[in-house]
Amino acid sequence: MKKLSILAGFVLLIFACKTDPGEKRITDPKDYDLHLSTTNRPTYEEAISSKEFWSKRLRPDSSGVGELGPLAGVYDLLFQTTGNPNFLRNAEKLYKKGMQISANDKDAFARGLAHNYISQHRFKEAYVLLQVTLEGPSNKHQTQLMLFDAAMEVGDYEKAYGYLGKIKNLKDYHYLIRLAKWSDHRGDLENAIHYLEEAKTIAESRDSKALKIWTYSNLGDYYGHAGRIKDSYELYLNTLALQPDNAYVMKSIAWIIYSEENNVQEAHRIMDSVMINHKLPDYHLFKAELYEFEGKVDFAKSSQIDFVNAVKDGKYGEMYNTFLIEIYSEAEPVKALKLAEREVQNRATPESYHLLALAQLKNGMTKEALRTIELYVEGKTCEPMALFHTTLVFKANELTDKVASVKKRLRDASFELGPLLTKKIETL
């Protein structure tokens, strides 16, 4: 998901700061227009068909073990294709039922449930479940793969590295994509890209559609982080060729059009199409940023409110805490602080702690915010929003030299941050 900034009340005419739309043109509507069709939904239609098939085979008392797993997987896929969290909860119930009644595949259902928990941002529950599963009869390799994922999510990096060592195999696709994630975590983007490119070669040699879709879209993200925007765009198009209704990739293309080309109207057009069938709340935040870029403050505020309401009405649980903390920090700082403290308990990572520091700062806790940054964020992540909030804390504490140092790093992340936040950084 792209990192979106919500800069309340910050309205600047910045069109002169970058080249005019067209001068840096990378994208072409002819490349993706076909995929904006709201009726071309092959992934969703296939998922619905599979749901009907497995539902009919499932016994009324849900006691058919062979049907529970596939049906739960279909519900997970339906969440991915619609953004409706009810599908995640449906899948959760089925995985739990499978663990309860299965004689031989409890660990497979446990891994499915753990993956479901991670999607719901219930990271600690996933981590504990996988640790228990590893101790019992299980496919150790598959469980250790997921334990790495869960350990990274909760910030247990020492254990994550240990799990990575246990599954080491440079010819294994699933090891390589995790090694890429570990490299990215350590700030080694060059090797992160290298390992994902190796994984891409394996996915293509197997001609696995699912693996190619995942690899192309994620490698496209890494290329974007590295400033290889054209390469990123090409991989997103490759993804759409395999999965025309991939909403994440369409949003990523819209981000290129906005952040790199300054073509706000085209970005709006893409997102308006995506949002018809795919209902993730954070799309409203992207729209808010586009409106703010145009100077349409009222529309931006309205879209931000739409986001908050969508999270509440959709019962998304903990899934959007990070975005809510940023929003609440401006208008309801006490609420932001409480939510940030809860998020740190759920996910003790630098990406959570920098939001805690932001909330502390907005509550006038300047020294506490600095302590949080120095203990849990500084030198522990290269994530642009973490660096931005670090800069705010350094400035509030009058650490001028540190502000200048971090600003240099942020300039290299202008594509990820977007033009609004990039301009804000220059004023610090």
Annotated model-derived regions:
Residues 30-31, 65, 102-110, 136-144, ...:
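Generic helix N-cap/helix-start motif at coil->alpha-helix transitions
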Residues 17-108, 128, 161, 404-428:
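N-terminal leader/linker segments that initiate helical-solenoid repeat arrays
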Residues 78, 82-85, 120, 154, ...:
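Structural motif corresponding to the intra-repeat A-B loop/turn of tetratricopeptide repeats
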